[in-house]
C-alpha cells in the first residue's frame, strides 16, 4: 500500500441518493496546441454515511475500496456549507 492517501476537494452536485453523493472535481488542463488553460470536470460518486452533505457544499473526499459498481470514494469532511 502507498503511504499517501489520495484525497480531493470538490463540490456536491447531487445528494438525492441515500448515503451517497455526487461530487464534481474541477481541474485546469493546458490545451496541447493553443496553450490555454481549460477547466475540466470529473464527477465521482462518494459515500456519505450520515447524509450530512447538501447540494453546493465543498467537501473533501478520499479514495477507498470499491463500495459498489460506481462508488469508490468516501467523505472525509465538509469544508464549507453552501450559502442559501
Swiss-Prot record:
GO terms for cellular component: cytosolic small ribosomal subunit. The keyword Ribosomal protein applies. SUPFAM superfamilies: Nucleic acid-binding proteins (SSF50249). InterPro entries: NA-bd_OB-fold (IPR012340), Ribosomal_uS17 (IPR000266), Ribosomal_uS17_bact/chlr (IPR019984), Ribosomal_uS17_CS (IPR019979). One of its GO terms (molecular function) is rRNA binding. One of the primary rRNA binding proteins, it binds specifically to the 5'-end of 16S ribosomal RNA. Part of the 30S ribosomal subunit. This is Small ribosomal subunit protein uS17. The lineage of its organism: Bacteria, Pseudomonadati, Pseudomonadota, Gammaproteobacteria, Vibrionales.
Amino acid at each position: 500500500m502507498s503511504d499517501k492517501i489520495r484525497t480531493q476537494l470538490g463540490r456536491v452536485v447531487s445528494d438525492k441518493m441515500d448515503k451517497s453523493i455526487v461530487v464534481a472535481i474541477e481541474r485546469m488542463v493546458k490545451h496541447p496546441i493553443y496553450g490555454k488553460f481549460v477547466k475540466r470536470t470529473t464527477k465521482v460518486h462518494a459515500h456519505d454515511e450520515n447524509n450530512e452533505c447538501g447540494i453546493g457544499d465543498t467537501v473533501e473526499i478520499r479514495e477507498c475500496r470499491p463500495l459498489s459498481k460506481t462508488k469508490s470514494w468516501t467523505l472525509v469532511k465538509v469544508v464549507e456549507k453552501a450559502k442559501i
